[in-house]
């Protein structure tokens, strides 16, 4: 204690204030029956150091990831639900544009298709214009004839005036003939041109090859007359069961037996007793 008092007196004589003197860690007051006690004040750096903020508690995991995480993922990864989410926090899957009113809730029933206008409808529909009106009359085209086999195929080109055809092949051949694209089949004997090989072969086999049109018409008329004459005889022979008693020969063209020139007329008159002056 005397030593401490002496040190204070020495400091006062030098003009040093006791507050400016900070004792070191070695200056310790000790008493009997007590523990050592530090008398030096705390360090100024400890007094003026700002207190560090307490760490924030961890945030609870949300059900939706941040926006930057969604943009970095691919399309199929964005559609998949997060595996870390519990079932009760997962969003319910639903249609992107709201509920579909046209879809039937029963999966066992097939989906209904919207029927187009004019197909299988007998009553006029409000959304279909022109329904319930009388259809306009129009000519049947080749496309309509193909789609409807029961309809008659006609050609309405110039000069045909609705000519009928029994099949599509005949109609196409007719178009090729009009356009000059049909294959020609000439007769090697008379040079007559046919558009069908069957017509050319019939022409050669029937004996009409080499005849002029007037002779051909005469032969055709004779054939028709022969058929008319033979028809009742054949019916009578079939009814009686006996063949006809005579054979019918084709008619023969009679050539003129006399020359009707002027001298022949004079001889005819002289033979009858007529005398001319």
From Swiss-Prot:
One annotated GO molecular function: zinc ion binding
One GO cellular component term: nucleus
Highest rank taxon of the organism: Eukaryota
Biological process annotations from GO: regulation of translation
Biased composition (Polar residues): 27-37
Keywords assigned by UniProt, alphabetized: Metal-binding, Nucleus, Translation regulation, Zinc, Zinc-finger
Compartment(s) where it occurs, according to its Swiss-Prot or TrEMBL record: Nucleus
Region of interest called Disordered, as start-end residue ranges on this chain: 23-66, 78-146
Principal cellular location given in the protein's record: nucleus
Residues in C2H2-type zinc fingers: 185-208
Task of the protein: C2H2-type zinc-finger transcription factor that controls the expression of the nonribosomal peptide synthases inpA and inpB, as well as of the other inp cluster-associated genes. Also mediates the expression of the asperfuranone biosynthesis gene cluster by binding to the afoA promoter. Probably recognizes the 5'-CT/C/AAAAGGAT/AT/GG/CA-3' motif in the promoters of teget genes.
Family the entry assigns: Belongs to the GLI C2H2-type zinc-finger protein family.
Name under which the protein is recorded: C2H2-type zinc-finger transcription factor
Gene responsible for this protein: scpR
